Amino acid sequence: MRDQKSLVADPRMLTLARDSRGWTQSELADEMTRLDGSRITQGYVSRAEAGRIPVREGRVQLFADALRYTADTLCRATDTAGAGVGLVHHRKRASLGAPALRRIHATLALTRLQVDSLARAADLHRNDRFRRVEVNDFDTPADAAETMREEWKVPAGPIEDMVALLEDAGALVVVRDLCTTELDAVSQWPPGGHPLILLNSHAPADRSRFSLAHELGHLVMHGEPGEGRVQEDQANRFAAEFLMPHDAVLPELKPGIDVSRLLDLKARWGVSMAALIRRAMDLGVISEWHYRTLMVELSALGYRTAEPTTIRRETPRHLAQAVTRLEQQLHLSPTETAHLAGLGREEFHEIYLCASSPSGHKDVPDSSAR
């Protein structure tokens, strides 16, 4: 940790931190006023974020206390820290507004800084099995999915654990509250780095698996910006083939599908009933009319909102293992580990241990906790 006298906030990091909290400049100014006792204006926050006035020493700490990040985090240079670098992919609904999307992008950027700091400190080994796969008029998204399954030696049939598969290939997966139900996952693979996927903790388990496969499709197929709808369709087709390979799922769909049969297939393949119906249509097992009829039936039963048959929720392991190493082998306190990620202890625990803690990880007394 740097001496407070050397602290100078990076203007872009101030904006990124505020966006990640979903606050306006006025809301941040109000919180700083509440904490400090003296009036902080929206204009002051605006000038600080624009770099027109330097934010030093005690004022850095005030911003940090209000935004609930460490002061060191706000002083990181965004052009060297990796924040905001790389193409961002997300599986979202059209109704997701710009402020919510800005918050998610900021959360992704700051999460990358956090996980990179933890992985580096723990000397976390990560495989490097991701690569770009070209998709064109001859090589389809389904071909790309088949290629990745072959290269990663995925056994035939349903995938047992998508999170484990992605982590073993070199990605880091973080399950956290993205403060919306309009987006299930977001991902990024910056140059020279490893893929990172944020999975919305609000997403149902069956939808989460498809979202992870969807993000994998983006990561391997879409290294450059493209037409949004085209890339979304390609990622969906990749995900369908990756999770439900045509040669394995087709014989199970061909006898015909109804709601009862869909429940059985959902439990076996670990995808939603809606995804199975779409797969059946795309493979020519049912007509578009039959597809629409089944979707109307799901709606009438209330299954478009919440489907029956619970699927096991898959949990990340690699970052929790890194935290265990930092605390048990390198003897860092929980607060010191949290500060490595630029967070307070409670928020760090909620993000990196509650949703992804392997059994056996326990909190230990921390005399340094504030």
Predicted regions and their residues:
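Active-site hotspot residues in diverse enzymes, especially metal/ion-binding acidic/histidine motifs
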Residues: 1-370
